[in-house]
Amino acid sequence: MPTINQLIRKPRQAPVEKSKVPALKACPQRRGVCTRVYTTTPKKPNSALRKVCKVKLTSGFEVISYIGGEGHNLQEHSVVLVRGGRVKDLPGVRYHTVRGSLDTAGVKDRKQSRSKYGAKRPKKA
């Protein structure tokens, strides 16, 4: 236990918080170019083919980004917007691609949670 005088000379250091999304360099999103678009399988006990892409960001990092929603139009050299947010059952995937922005199309025929998938409001019949 330090004395008051010791604390006056050298105050307590607050622990430094490590960023969960270092490639974004303290920005909300970053633009990048897809270098590879592929599917991968999740950890146990889940089973699926999750759509992901390797993205070279403007910050210089190359990261793996998850493509949410049903169906996508991404291929190599597509320009995408990447936000933070990990995918719990995919190790190493700490970013999400933003749907409906830059070269990424929104999810077709999406009725609920549209803003998360870049889907426009459907026309009234």
Curated annotation (Swiss-Prot):
Signal peptide: none
Top-level taxon of the source organism: Bacteria
Basic residues biased stretches: 113-125
Key words of the record: Methylation, Ribonucleoprotein, Ribosomal protein, RNA-binding, rRNA-binding, tRNA-binding
GO BP, sorted A to Z: translation
NCBIfam families named in the record: rpsL_bact
Assembly and interaction partners: Part of the 30S ribosomal subunit. Contacts proteins S8 and S17. May interact with IF1 in the 30S initiation complex.
Function: With S4 and S5 plays an important role in translational accuracy. Interacts with and stabilizes bases of the 16S rRNA that are involved in tRNA selection in the A site and with the mRNA backbone. Located at the interface of the 30S and 50S subunits, it traverses the body of the 30S subunit contacting proteins on the other side and probably holding the rRNA structure together. The combined cluster of proteins S8, S12 and S17 appears to hold together the shoulder and platform of the 30S subunit.
PANTHER family in UniProt: 30S RIBOSOMAL PROTEIN S12 FAMILY MEMBER
Protein name as it appears in the record: Small ribosomal subunit protein uS12
Organism ancestry: Bacteria, Pseudomonadati, Pseudomonadota, Betaproteobacteria, Nitrosomonadales
